[in-house]
C-alpha cells in the first residue's frame, strides 16, 4: 500500500554551514491494515518521513508510493484525493480555539461540501468512537489534554480515511491519557485502518508489540515485526 524507495531528504545549508541530512537512503513498505511504529530520538527523521508521505516535503532522491501512485507526481489540484485517504494526528492538536468539539470535527466535512445531515450523522458517530459525546459543545480550553487529542483523532477519522498518521500524539500527555490514546488507535486499527505511529516513548513501543522501524540519524537501523525499545 505504502512504499518508500531509496528516499533521501537533504536540506541546504544555512549561511556557511553544512547541509542537513534528515533522511538517507530509506526503503520500506507498509501493508494495508498494518500497524507500524516509526521510532527514534528527536531529530532522527520520523516527522520528515510522514511529511514526505503527505507530499508536504519533496525528497532529494527516491520515490514514495501510495497505492501504486508516486505521491510527488500528483498534480496540486488532485492533492485532496490523497489527503482524503489519509488522516493525520499531531502532538499539538491543531484545534480551532473558537470552535466547539463538534464544530472542530465538522469543519473537515464542511470543507468537503457535505450536507448538514451527513455532517450531523458522521460527527455523532466519531464522537461516540472517541468517547466525547458529552463534550460535543465544549471549547478546547474547557477540555483536558487527553480530550483535546481525542478531538484531533475524531477529526482525522471523520472522512473515513484508509490510513492514520499519528506524529507523537501522546507527547504532551500524562501516562493515563497516553494509554487512553493508544487504546483508541488500536480500536481504529481493528476497524480496518492502516496506522503509522511516530513516537520515542519506550512504554508505548514495548506495550504494543507491533512492527517497529527504528531510525537513527535519518537511516533505518532496525525493522522488526515485533520490536521493542532499543536505543
Describe the residue ranges of each PLM region.
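A short, proline-enriched helix->beta-strand linker immediately N-terminal to the Walker B motif
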Residues: 158-162
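Catalytic Walker B motif of ABC-type/P-loop ATPase nucleotide-binding domains
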Residues: 164-167
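Conserved ABC ATPase signature
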Residues: 139-143, 147
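Helix-to-loop junction immediately C-terminal to a conserved catalytic motif
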Residues: 54
Amino acid at each position: 500500500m505504502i512504499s518508500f524507495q531509496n528516499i533521501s531528504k537533504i536540506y541546504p545549508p544555512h549561511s556557511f554551514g553544512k547541509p542537513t541530512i534528515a533522511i538517507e537512503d530509506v526503503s520500506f513498505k507498509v501493508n494495508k491494515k498494518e500497524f507500524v511504529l516509526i521510532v527514534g530520538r528527536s531529530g532522527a527523521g520520523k516527522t520528515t518521513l510522514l511529511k514526505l508521505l503527505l507530499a508536504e516535503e519533496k525528497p532529494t532522491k527516491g520515490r514514495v508510493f501510495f497505492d501504486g501512485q508516486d505521491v510527488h507526481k500528483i498534480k496540486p489540484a488532485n492533492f485532496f484525493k490523497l489527503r482524503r485517504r489519509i488522516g493525520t494526528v499531531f502532538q499539538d492538536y491543531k484545534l480551532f480555539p473558537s470552535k466547539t468539539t463538534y464544530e472542530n470535527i465538522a469543519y473537515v466535512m464542511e470543507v468537503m461540501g457535505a450536507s448538514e445531515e451527513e455532517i450531523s450523522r458522521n460527527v455523532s458517530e466519531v464522537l461516540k468512537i472517541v468517547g466525547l459525546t458529552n463534550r460535543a459543545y465544549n471549547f478546547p480550553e474547557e477540555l483536558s489534554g487527553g480530550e483535546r487529542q481525542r478531538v484531533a483523532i475524531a477529526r482525522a477519522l471523520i472522512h473515513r480515511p484508509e490510513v492514520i498518521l499519528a506524529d507523537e500524539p501522546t507527547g504532551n500527555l500524562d501516562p493515563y491519557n497516553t494509554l487512553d490514546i493508544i487504546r483508541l488507535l488500536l480500536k481504529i486499527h481493528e476497524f480496518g485502518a492502516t496506522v503509522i505511529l511516530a513516537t520515542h516513548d519506550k512504554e508505548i513501543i514495548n506495550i504494543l508489540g507491533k512492527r517497529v522501524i527504528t531510525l537513527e540519524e535519518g537511516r533505518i537501523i532496525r525493522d522488526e515485526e515485533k520490536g521493542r525499545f532499543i536505543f
